[in-house]
Amino acid sequence: MSANYIEVQIFGQVLRLHCPPDQQENLLASAQRLEERVALLKDQSGIIQLEKVLAIVALNLNYELEQEKQKNANNKAVLESCIHQLDNSLSKLLSGSSVAINQESV
């Protein structure tokens, strides 16, 4: 098997996927978590059709991803606001220092 491909077994099916060597461990862990989520949903819901369970898990994962994107956007906005406030404070502080220095030299 090429170093750029990895075989992953999901629900009894072997998938051969292109994957950089430094990301193979994460891909295997992701496949394991996917199997766990599907098994949990099947147990909790009683749904036995794999296609339905996969669709629900995919929808849940996408929803969680969108929530994380929104959190990241909110965090970015807060950080940008803090940086702007710090920049303004620093500018005021530095402009006040230059005025004080100019007055001392007069």
Swiss-Prot record:
GO cellular component term of the entry, any: cell division site
Highest taxon listed in the record's lineage: Bacteria
Protein name in UniProt: Cell division protein ZapA
Transmembrane segments: none
Family: Belongs to the ZapA family. Type 1 subfamily.
Coiled coil: 22-81
GO biological process, one term: division septum assembly
Cellular compartments annotated: Cytoplasm
Quaternary structure and partners: Homodimer. Interacts with FtsZ.
Species, as recorded: Actinobacillus pleuropneumoniae serotype 5b (strain L20)
Keywords: Cell cycle, Cell division, Coiled coil, Cytoplasm, Septation
Pfam families listed in its UniProt record: ZapA
Protein's job: Activator of cell division through the inhibition of FtsZ GTPase activity, therefore promoting FtsZ assembly into bundles of protofilaments necessary for the formation of the division Z ring. It is recruited early at mid-cell but it is not essential for cell division.
Gene3D superfamilies: Cell division protein ZapA protomer, N-terminal domain (3.30.160.880)
